[in-house]
C-alpha cells in the first residue's frame, strides 16, 4: 500500500516511527506537510496538489494534525475523504476532539465520567460557576490551550474569581473544572487503536505542578489499568468517532474520569516508557480496513 502521513514535522519521533512501521510491513510511506497541500474542489474529480504535483495513488492517510492548524488540517483530511482515500481519523472526529467543550458534551451525552465542568460567558455568572464545580480549588482552562498550556489551578475562591474575570475580560473562552485532588498531579494515558488499548502509562507532573504533561517536565511510568478504565477509554474514543487516540484518565474517589481525548497523541513518551510499539497496531488496523473496503467485506474494528 501507499500510505501518506500528514505531518508538519518529518523529523519528529512520532513521524519517523510511523514511517518505519509502514515500511517494516512492506508499504510505501510518504510524509506530507499538511500546510503545503492545496486543493482543487470540484464536483467531478476533487484533488490535492503538493509541490506542483497532484497527489495520487494513496490507499490510506494517517493524519497527525497539529492543534495550531486544525482548521486547515481538517480541510485537507476531508479532501482525501472526498477522493475515496481511507483516513485513520476522519475530519469530523478530529474537529470534535479538538473542541474541548464539544468533546465534553459528547462524553456527557454518552454518560462517560468526567470532572464536573462549567462554561459561561458573563462575568456576573462567576460566583455560581465556581459553586457549580464544587468551589475552590478548581482548574481553569483555555479552550484553545494544548499540552498543559493555558491551564491554571486556582487555590482559593478569590484567586478563581480574579483569573476567570481576567480571561473573560480578554474575551477568551474558558472552562472551569473541578480539581481532583486525589489524583495528586498524575493521570493515565491510554493509547487506543480501534477497539483496543494497545499501551498505557501513568504520567506524573513535576513536584509542585498539578499538570502531568510530559512536555512540561512530567515523567512516565508503566501502569496496569483496570477493566473499567480500559472500557472507558475505548468508549471515549468511540464517542468522538476516532480510531487512533490518546485518552487521559484521572483516578478519583468516585472512579475513573476522562480528562481529554487526543486525536494526535504523542508516540515517543508512551513507547519509551512502556517499550511497546503503538505504531505497528496503527498500520495493522489500516491494512485490515483497506482490505475490507476493497473486497466490500463488513468492517469490524
Swiss-Prot record:
Family classification: Belongs to the RimK family.
ATP-grasp domain location: 104-287
Keyword annotations from UniProtKB, A to Z: ATP-binding, Ligase, Magnesium, Manganese, Metal-binding, Nucleotide-binding, Protein biosynthesis
Record: residues binding ATP: 141, 178-179, 187, 211-213
This protein's GO CC annotations: cytoplasm
Binding site for Mn(2+) 1: 248, 260
Positions of disulphide bridges: none
InterPro entries to which the protein is assigned, alphabetical: ATP-grasp, ATP-grasp_RimK-type, ATP_grasp_subdomain_1, RimK, Rimk_N, Rp_bS6_RimK/Lys_biosynth_LsyX
CC cofactor: Mg(2+); Mn(2+)
Comment on bound cofactor: Binds 2 magnesium or manganese ions per subunit.
A biological process from GO: SOS response
Binding site for Mg(2+) 2: 260, 262
Protein name per its UniProtKB record: Probable alpha-L-glutamate ligase 1
EC code: 6.3.2.-
Any Pfam family hit: RimK
SUPFAM superfamilies, A to Z: Glutathione synthetase ATP-binding domain-like
Enzyme class, UniProt record, top EC level: ligase
Binding site for Mn(2+) 2: 260, 262
GO molecular function: ATP binding; metal ion binding; ribosomal S6-glutamic acid ligase activity
Residues that hold Mg(2+) 1 according to the record: 248, 260
Amino acid at each position: 500500500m501507499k500510505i501518506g502521513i500528514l505531518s508538519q514535522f518529518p523529523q519528529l519521533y512520532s513521524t519517523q516511527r510511523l514511517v518505519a512501521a509502514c515500511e517494516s510491513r512492506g508499504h510505501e510511506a510518504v510524509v506530507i506537510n499538511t500546510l503545503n497541500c492545496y486543493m482543487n474542489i470540484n464536483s467531478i474529480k476533487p484533488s490535492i496538489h503538493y509541490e506542483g504535483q497532484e497527489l495520487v495513488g494513496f490507499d490510506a492517510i494517517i493524519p497527525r494534525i497539529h492543534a495550531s492548524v486544525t482548521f486547515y488540517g481538517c480541510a485537507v483530511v476531508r479532501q482525501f475523504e472526498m477522493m475515496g482515500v481511507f483516513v485513520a481519523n476522519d475530519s469530523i472526529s478530529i474537529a470534535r476532539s479538538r473542541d474541548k467543550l464539544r468533546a465534553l458534551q459528547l462524553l456527557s451525552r454518552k454518560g462517560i465520567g468526567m470532572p464536573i465542568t462549567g462554561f459561561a460567558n458573563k462575568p456576573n455568572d462567576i460566583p455560581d460557576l465556581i459553586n457549580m464545580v464544587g468551589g475552590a480549588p478548581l482548574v481553569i482552562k483555555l479552550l484553545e490551550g494544548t499540552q498543559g498550556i493555558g491551564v491554571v489551578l486556582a487555590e482559593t475562591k478569590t484567586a478563581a474569581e480574579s483569573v476567570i474575570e481576567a480571561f473573560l475580560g480578554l474575551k477568551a473562552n474558558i472552562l472551569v473544572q473541578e480539581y481532583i485532588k486525589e489524583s495528586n498531579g498524575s493521570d493515565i494515558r491510554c493509547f487506543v487503536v480501534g477497539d483496543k488499548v494497545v499501551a498505557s502509562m501513568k504520567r506524573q507532573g513535576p513536584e509542585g505542578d498539578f499538570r502531568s504533561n510530559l512536555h512540561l517536565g512530567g515523567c512516565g511510568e508503566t501502569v496496569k489499568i483496570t477493566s473499567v478504565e480500559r472500557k472507558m477509554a475505548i468508549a471515549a474514543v468511540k464517542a468522538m468517532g476516532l480510531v487512533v487516540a490518546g485518552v487521559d484518565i484521572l483516578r478519583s474517589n468516585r472512579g475513573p474520569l476522562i480528562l481529554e481525548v487526543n486525536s494526535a497523541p504523542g508516540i515517543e513518551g508512551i513507547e519509551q516508557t512502556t517499550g511497546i510499539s503503538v505504531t505497528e497496531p496503527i498500520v495493522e488496523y489500516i491494512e485490515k480496513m483497506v482490505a475490507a473496503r476493497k473486497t466490500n467485506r463488513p468492517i469490524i474494528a
